[in-house]
Amino acid sequence: MKKQIGKNLMQKWKNKIRVRLSALDKKKLVLTNIPYILTAFYTNRASFLYRNSLGEDIGNKLLYAMEHADRILTGLQPSFNWRDMLTGIVAAVILKLLVWQKQSDAKKLRKGIEYGSARWGNAEDIKPYMSEDPWMNIPLTATEALTMESRPKQPKYARNKNIVVIGGSGSGKTRFFVKPSVMQMNCSMVITDPKGTLIEECGKMLAKGPPKKDKNGNIMKDKSGKVVHEPYVIKVLNTINFSKSLHYNPFAYIRSEKDILKLVTTIIVNTKGEGEKASEYFWVKAEKLLYTALIAFIWYEGDEEEKNLNTLLDLLNESETREEDETYQNPVDMMFQELEERDPQHFAVRQYKKYKMAAGKTAKSILISCGARLAPFDIAELREIMSYDEMELDKIGDRKTALFLIMSDTDTTFNFVIAMLQSQLFNLLCDKADDEYGGRLPVHVRVIADEFANIGQIPQFDKLIATIRSREISASIILQSQSQLKAMYKDSADTILGNCDTTLFLGGKEKTTLKEMSELLGKETIDLYNTSETRSNQKSFGLNYQKTGKQLMTEDEIAVMDGGKCILQIRGARPFFSDKYDITKHKNYRLLADENEKNRYKVEKELNPQYTPKSEEEVEVIHVELSE
């Protein structure tokens, strides 16, 4: 019995040793022990030579061994005498102990980077993040770019295409970032155009489009040898001059009750109610109930031509209440009563009944706040623009499209329309990618949001920007300072910035931005040289050299940065201090109105086929002779 227990214990120990040996890196084990094996071998040979040396005492033996020391290195046969073997093992063990002692007492020195290892990036640092095909890059600086490929050869260099661009007024956000991105023409683009000039300067180039390529990436040509181009579908929503805008109807993109709730939230967030009560939680919730009920009624029960915000306004105008007569029924009450008789569980009915719990005076206050909130829709031009839809937002990820959102940079009255569109756009494209394309749109969609802080608040944007990457959607947020984003999105601002792998700083003087930029750049280690002079009967001088840490670029250095320079930061890479992108060197610059005024895109003419050109405009006259 005892023998059996002993055998079991031995077997367990053997198994443990076998497991330990299998877990070891055998190659590393051999390489790290080669010095000790060689020490044991040559000490063994030296001991053998000493024992067989001629001489009667230790001194003579040592002299003989030293004279014939070359014999230690020439032979490959170790001595198997126990004395020689023991000497070799002891020497190897002593060496191992000395090395171990040295390593345990070693100082953890970081020579040259004691106070920080920050440095500026170079060509080798940016190379993994750029595509070999220059047309598949997002130009960032004169020397750096970011690949559009979502799955690079080395996954560790994959970065999302969300970009934060920060630059004060006049720093060249449009010229040095937006236009180079547009000139690449490598994806669909949704571009906010605060001045309405970008579409005029780039529209003709987009209408022509980039060269069409086959599956192998080769440029296609027609039978005559001319390059075949792939024109962009150009869409425009202009809230400055409605005559130069296509129509946008948010009702056209409602697919479910969930979309109704999202639309109502967007309207509430980006518009203002009436008086002090408008911002109170109760009144906002009450307004939401009424909007939800009316929009649901229109969407479910209305005719196709009635499904728009104009009908919503008409229903609000008919929703009269009388404080002195709680039993009074307005036309809207009657419509909902009829609907309830047909379908008591109807979504619109359930929302309306909750709203009708309010007393007459309260309901009247709610209606006043609703009317004030939607007051901009009383403008006939805006009502006409939103009467039907021409935007085709759900097709932007199917084909190359350029959607220009023109808004005023001085008046925010109609910016909620832009926010409404962008909110619907993100949700539409995400749903389409998941439902129809297995999670990835066939054409990447870039939202280039110039003057992002003036657009209006997009509900749950902090969550959207974290999830759109996998759907082939990206956002380029363009700001004058980081404080703008924090003012708009409060605590969510840091989450939004954290989901942007790339930051491009074009210049500015806002304190918060300068401080955060300086901290992100980190510290470098520099040599500090001090001199001292003591004056007494005898003068004495002193010199002192030491290391210290310094910000790679201090706040004041960033504030006075050369106007032609910029700072680029990509997650996982060293920061880059580079020249701003020179758009005149881009191959497509010749197609812009900046280069040739003849390339100016006539928005009104393109949107309205019956447009009559002005006397000062150049027109091309084509004579066609028709035979019988």
Where would I find each of the regions flagged by the language model?
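Basic- and hydrophobic-enriched, low-structure N-terminal and domain-boundary segments
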Residues: 1-171, 175-178, 215-223, 523, ...
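P-loop NTPase motor domains
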Residues: 2-5, 38-42, 159-473, 488, ...
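Short alpha-helical interface patches
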Residues: 69-76, 83-137, 257-267, 315-318, ...
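Intrinsically disordered, low-complexity N-terminal regions enriched in serine/proline/glycine
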Residues: 79, 114, 128, 132-136, ...
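A broad, low-specificity signal for short, low-complexity segments enriched in glycine/proline
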Residues: 96, 122-128, 142-155, 362-368, ...
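General secondary-structure edge motif
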Residues: 116-118, 145, 149, 161-162, ...
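Conserved long hydrophobic alpha-helices within structured protein cores
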Residues: 133, 137-140, 416-423, 517
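Conserved ATP-driven motor cores of ASCE-family P-loop NTPases powering translocation/secretion/packaging/pilus
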Residues: 465-567
